Amino acid sequence: MATRVRPIDRRAFLTGLAGIAAGVAVDAPSLAAGPLQSALFDLDQQFFASAQKKPDGRYAISILDDVGQELAQVGLPDRGHGIAVSPDRQTLIAFARRPGTFALIIRPFDGSEPKLISAIKGRHFYGHGCFSGDGRLMYAVENDYEVGRGIIGIYDLSGRKATRIGEFETFGIGPHEILLSSDQKTLIVANGGILTHPAKPREKLNLETMAPSIVFLDAATGDLITQHQIALHLHQLSLRHMTQDATGRVWIGGQFEGPETKTPPLVATCGKDTPLRLHDIPAKITSGLQNYIGSVTANRDGSVIATSAPRGGKVLFWKADTMNFIGAQSIPDGCGISPIDQQSFLISDGNGGLSFLDDSTGSPIVLARAPGTSWDNHMTAI
């Protein structure tokens, strides 16, 4: 049975482990070599997943434990981005980075063959999706690129293969992250506002007319419940990534597409019945963030929010109940961030590093660094 680290001992344990593991690349087995048998692990063991680019240029999804050890890999046909986790924690869906057209269904604990989902003609994925409350459906944000509108593709996963059974509109352009509300009745979508087309894969076609928004949709019907739009003078603040705190309040990270001389607030909150509110970051920190928030997550009890700023080499922390900024830690190119427990986080970076961080109070501990590996933008708790 895997050794568990009690929270009180975790930092001391990881400090010792880091002295051994940092700089050591672990050759993890692929799932083809055998599943991660649940019976071999403590049922309370935490697992994590992230997309990565390997030293040989190929792409994969890696399964990790809570001390940063790589347990398994699943190959991807191209670069991955976000990962959705089913309510029972048995199924992962890895999404291609925009403008990719694949999603991969992975069941890491039973060793079954991964199953490929391909976007329908005229669509591509935006890198994110989520499950319905019962795990039967998957909602994937998509680009209807000839029309220039955001779509949520609805996929039934109950059969032998995923079947696309319908779609909802996102009432915006460039949908990015999608969440299921804590009551499982509402879909929350961050419409980034940026028009793109796969013929010009990374070109942004409408920066002068961007209209980002956060929308709340009825998960059963797709009906629009609420749409929060950002103030006109900040219309180039693309709203991208989200999480929910303990109260269900939505926290959003933005990426500013306007002049580099401007440094608007990059973190916002809202609720179904509460308008968007932007939150100030100290000027001495804001000036170095390069107007970019990469990932947004909450700790296990939803009392602390972490927002990564990889271009500025910072992770920023917020107290959820007061919505106040409480501190920052430096991790060069640190972007993927996921909670381990009530106070600590596992963070990945673009230089192959995996770090442990005690919210805003402790210096990061580098657990491992795989030379030539580049972790993608998101770390997801399974």
What is the meaning of each model-derived region?
Residues 120-128, 141-181:
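Asp-box/WD-like beta-propeller blade repeats and closely related beta-sheet repeat scaffolds
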Residues 2-20:
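N-terminal secretory signal peptides and thylakoid transit peptides that target proteins
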Residues 74-105, 110-131:
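Blade-loop segments of beta-propeller domains
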Residues 152-157, 208-219, 265-272:
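Beta-propeller blade signature
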Residues 87-88, 133-134, 182-183, 245-247, ...:
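Residue-level detector of Asp-centered blade-edge/turn motifs that repeat once per structural unit
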Residues 69-74, 114-119, 163-168, 225-231, ...:
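A short beta-strand motif characteristic of beta-propeller blades
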Residues 141-144, 189-209, 253-264:
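Short, conserved, GDST-rich strand-edge loop motifs in beta-rich repeat architectures
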Residues 79-85, 124-130, 173-177, 236-241, ...:
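Repeated scaffold domains used in trafficking and secretory/extracellular systems
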